Amino acid sequence: MAATLKSLKLVRYRAFCSPSAFGAVRSVSYWNVSSTQHGGQDPPEHISLCHSAKKVKNICSTFSSRRILTTSSAHPGLEFSKTSSSKASTLQLGSPRATGVDEEDVEVFDSFENMRVFLQLRPEYRVHSYNASETSQLLSVSEGELILHKVRVNQNNLQAQVIVDYLCKLSSLPAEQHPVLLGSTSFALLCQLSVKKIQLFDTQDLINVLKAFVILGIPHSHSMLDVYETKCCHQVWEMNMDQLLLVADLWRYLGRKVPRFLNIFSSYLNLHWKDLSLSQLVHLIYVIGENRQVSQDLMQKLESLILKYIDLINLEEVGTICLGFFKSSTNLSEFVMRKIGDLACANIQHLSSRSLVNIVKMFRFTHVDHINFMKQIGEIAPQRIPSLGVQGVMHLTLYCSALRFLNEGVMNAVAASLPPRVAHCRSKDVAKILWSFGTLNYKPPNAEEFYSSLISEIHRKMPEFNQYPEHLPTCLLGLAFLEYFPVELIDFALSPGFVRLAQERTKFDLLKELYTLDGTVGIECPDYRGNRLSTHLQQEGSELLWYLAEKDMNSKPEFLETVFLLETMLGGPQYVKHHMILPHTRSSDLEVQLDVNLKPLPFNREATPAENVAKLRLEHVGVSLTDDLMNKLLKGKARGHFQGKTESEPGQQPMELENKAAVPLGGFLCNVADKSGAMEMAGLCPAACMQTPRMKLAVQFTNRNQYCYGSRDLLGLHNMKRRQLARLGYRVVELSYWEWLPLLKRTRLEKLAFLHEKVFTSAL
């Protein structure tokens, strides 16, 4: 048996042209499902039907000469018996069809059929979709044996139409006999004859045979289906839209990816997309989503049709459209998403949980903040969550975090429902749920039970995390945002073995996540003695994040103006440093240092021009906010009071900057001497005479994406950054977007006064 299957993997199309090849064969399954799905492999781009037939002939002598199969009976055929059907029933069939489930268990359901509910809502769908519930008159066992006998006897004379008829009739055998049929060499012969005659099949023949294959559960990985895909490709331009959709649906039911057929189908659609009816449009979007294969140009055309039919689409179809666009990674415009949100809000109580989850997926993907829809979600989601499967709960939670939408009722319902059924979570579900709670910086009332159950599940799911390593850092960061640090898991995630695994096994670059975790542990877990990232990876992560942060901030005119105003107010660029105090937190800061007299220190060596390093005298550093100055500011008459003045002092020799004296994070070196209101920076003096800054300020230039939606509550990452800055002795000065951005439209003096108050009031 093993030798047979190995041989069948090497030969693309099997055929037993000589009856003697069957003489020693009885009831052996040639249809075992491969452990590797076809979807994970690239099928050949071009397959010649004539070439396939030649392969069939060449295989005949090979299998005739090899006595690789043995049995106790010399008579080939199909024995339909209770014993054989019982044994064969353990075989895994290839078709993802419905199975009986306990309706009370929300975690057990047929997701394949669940996504096809929309096909039952209009009679038009019956024309271009496959309905698994359709029944036909059953074929008796004796009639089936007779057909297989005719195949053996008349194999050289069977016509194409007869082959199609036989396949269709055999698919009407009782379901319990299907595995036995698949184990019959006579049925294998019939299938090979269909390959030889396939050039004579017309469109309807092709559809009927594919239906028979679906009913019988032909494994999706079987090489014979390559020939059928090629025939479908050749037949595309002979089919109408209904037939094309039906063929695509049948391939989906077989569970086989057919990229070549879909590419040609797309070409057909580019010419005929305007002719799509409503049912054809929705069904097409479903097919596209399930195959994850589409051109963006075609999807834009389909979006225009969605608008055309928007008032006729029902809620299940809305969910199907959202899921199709989501799975194909295609955006819907904000205008269409708002229309969809309006439709959902108008009948929110009648919206199925399935459609609700599909719609929130698309809102998450497009980041459209439909306020009324968000409010409605806050009202109905807590009632729906107990009846949702954990995957649905995960998508709902992730929607909330992606839109920064903190609704305590929703989050509490999620936290209450998960602990009893945490075993149903995949590693992905655990990761996304922990990330969502951490991102929203929210601890539910049952936080202890909630987090302990999820952390325990991470331990149980470790084999799964080895397969999908990207989910483990996501889990641990979500926990770290809320100050949970499971040491054993962190030690494993930062181990050289896991880091190497993460680099090799995932398409995602996890360096940023691992670097953020590593930096967080270094600050918040002083007693931690486990694994840390290598110095090389830390440096690489720091450089990457600084490049991204600097590029982002320097592209914002409002930020550049803020830097200039701070430099003007404090006395020059050497008093302000734009950098990442905590590189692992992914955002930059404007650092200011003050001495014991709350005067700014010129600590930024990088801002000092090389020609002026020898001697720098700065006068009038900083601005004292006196009553006289405030009067001038309010009257708008002050001019030039914020400009620092520099000049070289004669008789002084330049001093050399000594890099060896540098110290990390917060230990920036400077030489400060206060003489009659003037400050001198003459390079770096020995550490003994250095003046340590009394206060280090981290000026935060914030935006609305750092806060929960419609509130002033920081998100998890940014709250964690503030927490860590405080641990390192920094005082945060927040230039909040709701205060600072409107002020940018005011006069320069008003902006300077605001900055002065922020910086020096925070110091007090």
Swiss-Prot record:
Transit peptide: 1-27
Post-translational modification N6-acetyllysine, affected residues: K507
Keyword Acetylation carried by entry: yes
Gene Ontology terms, MF aspect: RNA binding; rRNA binding
GO cellular component annotations of the record: mitochondrial matrix; mitochondrial nucleoid; mitochondrion; ribonucleoprotein granule
Family: Belongs to the FAST kinase family.
Official protein name in the record: FAST kinase domain-containing protein 5, mitochondrial
Organism field: Homo sapiens
Lineage: Eukaryota, Metazoa, Chordata, Craniata, Vertebrata
Gene this chain is encoded by: FASTKD5
